[in-house]
Amino acid sequence: MMKVVSPRTRSDSITEKVFRRVYSNFNISTVEDEYIHRQRSSDYEKESRLRKRGLEDKEEVMEMEQMGAERIKTVLILMSDTGGGHRASAEAIRDAFKIEFGDDYRIIIKDVWKEYTGWPLNDMERQYKFMVKHVGLWSVAFHGTSPKWIHKSYLSALAAYYAKEIEAGLMEYKPDIIISVHPLMQHIPLWVMKWQGLHKKVIFVTVITDLNTCHRTWFHHGVSRCYCPSKEVAKRALVDGLDDSQIRVFGLPVRPSFPRTILNKNELRKELEIDLNLPAVLLMGGGEGMGPVQKTALALGDSLYNSKESNPIGQLIVICGRNKVLASTLASHEWKIPVKVRGFETQMEKWMGACDCIITKAGPGTIAEALICGLPIILNDYIPGQEKGNVPYVVDNGAGVFTRSPKETAKIVADWFSNNKEELKKMSENALKLSQPEAVFDIVKDIHHLSQQQQRIPLFNEFSY
């Protein structure tokens, strides 16, 4: 229990200001009163309510507690659409819970910041999209906020100011378990939960969605678990003060359709109407179809055509995402090789399963999915900061190469498809070795184990608002 300190003649601490602000609507005169109010015996409160129903026997109280322990548990996943990877990881975790545990858990995915707070927290998506288009600005923001004293001061001020709103967001869903899949969703909710006395009552875990380089805001010593996608990230967690018992290295959570669906390449090609006999390269532009997609596609159109024999040596599939202008431009081009131009796709496991290699920027989710499919990877760009470390993660493990040049990219693919098929095969084997297809299932099973250990009726149910 938190020690109660009588008010002294001094300026209020941030914690006291937060409590005074949060509980001003409940006629609680002081922070001390609220601490005392929250420290009442939970057994006393349960029995008081049960007496009103005529259930005064302690055995019946224990029976009710056991029933509460077996009820459907609520999992709140905190995320933000700052890049597509956070939502994808959240949805992968949701789907894995459903596959493994059926209706035992109710999964809610929310951007609590966007729905309950004000600026700047509710505007992170727009700010992120602006900064990644100006990579120099993003690099300054990423590295400038990395020192602990800077981001802790900034986040603690936001936590104090928006404590009431964040509490309301958490209270609405009454979670038994909170999962953060975003670097800015550790410190603030954990501080607010601690100020409320909830940090020992609700399981809070972090699932890191960056493969190698990651921001220090991912790490908070107050979590029950920190799930790291690689040993490199786990080492950073230890350096930042987490205990070894809090850390698990399972890999990056990807959609269960990747590891759990057995896909035959020829059957997929028939379904997707792709040539069965030509090797295929998958060119990704991300959800927004960004990067040098058009230049790379045109270069591949030339390099994969054997002008001497007047026939193609490979075929191209381009995923343009939501970029309709790009899709229209490529679709209207006269190609000398088989080309499929697609928009936003929801079944990427099929397109990856039908191809022989992939060209993409260094997004962690796409890399993890490609590794599971055994695809050699050509990385053609990265966002400074969190994606930079993904390049050596792929290249140093022999699963791919890096080049920003569309012409060089096209040359590498043509070489793989003609004179250097052994290198393509070796990289495919290395990709499979590096993959962690069961990561999302290992994560949800471990969270379930934590939940079983903490059989309890959540403190959220002890208060009515």
Swiss-Prot record:
Disulfide bonds: none annotated. It catalyses: a 1,2-diacyl-sn-glycerol + UDP-alpha-D-galactose = a 1,2-diacyl-3-O-(beta-D-galactosyl)-sn-glycerol + UDP + H(+); 1,2-di-(9Z,12Z-octadecadienoyl)-sn-glycerol + UDP-alpha-D-galactose = 1,2-di-(9Z,12Z-octadecadienoyl)-3-beta-D-galactosyl-sn-glycerol + UDP + H(+); 1-(9Z-octadecenoyl)-2-hexadecanoyl-sn-glycerol + UDP-alpha-D-galactose = 1-(9Z-octadecenoyl)-2-hexadecanoyl-3-beta-D-galactosyl-sn-glycerol + UDP + H(+); 1,2-di-(9Z-octadecenoyl)-sn-glycerol + UDP-alpha-D-galactose = 1,2-di-(9Z-octadecenoyl)-3-beta-D-galactosyl-sn-glycerol + UDP + H(+). Auxin activates expression during Pi starvation, whereas cytokinin represses it. Belongs to the glycosyltransferase 28 family. It comes from Arabidopsis thaliana (Mouse-ear cress). The keyword DNA-binding does not apply. Induction: Induced by phosphate deprivation. Induced in rosette leaves when grown in acidic soil. Inhibited by galvestine-1. Its EC number is 2.4.1.46. One of its GO terms (molecular function) is 1,2-diacylglycerol 3-beta-galactosyltransferase activity. Expressed mainly in roots. Detected in flowers, leaves, stems, siliques and pollen tubes. PANTHER family: MONOGALACTOSYLDIACYLGLYCEROL SYNTHASE, MONOGALACTOSYLDIACYLGLYCEROL SYNTHASE 3, CHLOROPLASTIC. Keywords: Chloroplast, Glycosyltransferase, Membrane, Plastid, Plastid outer membrane, Transferase, Transit peptide. It is found in: Plastid, Chloroplast outer membrane. Optimum pH is 7.0. InterPro entries: Diacylglyc_glucosyltr_N, Glyco_trans_28_C, Glycosyltransf_28_UgtP. It is an enzyme of class 2 (transferase). The gene is MGD3. This is Monogalactosyldiacylglycerol synthase 3, chloroplastic. One of its GO terms (cellular component) is chloroplast outer membrane. Pfam families: Glyco_tran_28_C (PF04101), MGDG_synth (PF06925). CDD domains: GT28_Beta-DGS-like (cd17507). One of its GO terms (biological process) is cellular response to phosphate starvation. Involved in the synthesis of monogalactosyldiacylglycerol, the major structural component of photosynthetic membranes and in the chloroplast envelope biogenesis. Can use both prokaryotic (18:1/16:0) or eukaryotic (18:2/18:2) 1,2-diacylglycerol species, but operates with some preference for the eukaryotic one. Plays a minor role in galactolipid synthesis in chloroplasts. Is essential for membrane lipid remodeling in phosphate-starved roots. Acts as the major factor involved in digalactosyldiacylglycerol (DGDG) biosynthesis in phosphate-starved roots. UDP binds at residues 86, 255, 365-369, 387.
